[in-house]
UniProtKB/Swiss-Prot annotation:
Organism domain of life: Eukaryota
Presence of keyword Ligase: no
Entry GO CC: nucleus; preribosome, small subunit precursor
Protein name from the UniProt record: Ribosomal RNA processing protein 1 homolog
Family to which the UniProt record says this protein belongs: Belongs to the RRP1 family.
Localization per record: Nucleus
Recorded name of the encoding gene: rrp1
Protein task: May be involved in the generation of 28S rRNA.
Residue stretches of biased makeup (Acidic residues): 346-412
UniProt biased composition (Low complexity): 427-452
Keyword Nucleus belongs to the record: yes
Polar residues bias locations: 453-478
Annotated region described as Disordered, given as residue ranges: 334-495
Keywords: Nucleus, rRNA processing
Amino acid sequence: MEEETKVVKKVTGPAKPQKLRSIDVELAQKLNTGSSQTKSSALYKLRSVVKNEKLTEIQLLKIWKGLFLSLYNTDKPIVQEEFSRDISKLTTYFKDYKDSLMFIKCFFIILQKHWDYIDKYRVDKFYSLVRKMLNSSFQILKKRNAQHEEGSEEEEARLALNEQIYSGLVKIFKSTVLNTSSDSTTNTNGVLLHFADIYLEELFKVTQGHMEPINLTKILLPFVNFLTKSEDDVSCKRIKERVFDRLLTTYSPFDKKDAYYLPKVGVSSSTPEIFPTDYEMFSKLFFKCASSKDTLEQNRKTLYGLKNQFKRAQAALEELEELADNIVLDENGDIVENPNVNPEDLQGDDSDDSDEEFDVDQMDSEDSGEGEFDDEIDADDAEELDDDDDEEFDEELDEEDEEEEEEEEEEVPPPPPTKNLKSKPSPVTQKNKQQQQQPPAKPAPITKKQQQSPAKPTQVTKKQQSPAKPTPVTKKQQSPVKPTSPKVVKKPTRK
């Protein structure tokens, strides 16, 4: 009996206290279950934990791992949209904005780490989650942006808080989705490309363009840093087209749309989307980055191009402001004449116009006097042109005579082929030679092939031609030698 009692004591003795699971592990496991009720209850509990407890970065990473797997296994588009919306709303439930920023940072870390596991059938719902999380990130700015009286302590505290939130978001985007270092958590740029596509759209949805130009410049600094240091040409091109080119067209007062703009509901010419952009500041910023020693050589061309684009946009904006100063609208919104214009100024303008008309008449009279002198010059030129026409007419007659001689030479049978001469006598020297000899019998016409033959006895070389320069053959000298009657051609008259 004693042995039996001892055994019973060992079995039925007090159990060791089990180690309690932390709240983050428990929530992650419940979120990863297949039951929709368990997921909804875990999400509701997570909402209360976020409001009342302070979580560390490691705990938030574990929670986001469970949320990622839960969305990965969720089917049906409507259910996916509701689940993504509930997840994104958690960002605004934190009491301290630092915890909200930490929650956003952990989201991008987990998403980039597991992006390679997302296939083409699940990528759309994660794109939707990225859009909603980015919208919630900008909601933090709007939530902390309550206006107070200028110069008050509350207003100064609000400005300091906004400065911290903007700088915090910039650091998160630089270290996660827009990270340019080689030790990045992912080798893909899928998140970055979609992030650049939706950045300005979600920012305008939250702010409606009501933000200071300096804050807009701060919130776009991660993209400028990426263009300066990144070696990814595809991502740099996407950022230029979807962020900065869009800032110069779609979200500008110039009534332009970028090449990738899609029409939206409720957006028209009467309600344009405009950001208060400081184009001059961006131009100086791009110039400073392009001329920096740390900038990659392959990215300088893009940065200098953006610098020139923003500089031209600043000049165009100044022209619009000058035009807007001269426009006055009535109660109905119609354009009316500016009442500040002095009528005496208009009269002064009329007197100036009369003076200009007088000057124009005087200039016309001066031009008419110069015209007579020009007529005299034209008459002298006409005489010179007539002399030139005579010389051209004589040259035409010479060419016709040569053509007739060539036709007669073609009738004679050609001699046997011989070697070609390097030098060829000119037709003018042949005519002079015929005039000097004047044989009693008419010699046979000389063909081109006979002129080229080396066996010709009477051959004129360049040395023989050099001392005695032949005089130009005139029309009278050619007439007695011609075997045929010269053609009579009327001399053209100059009009």
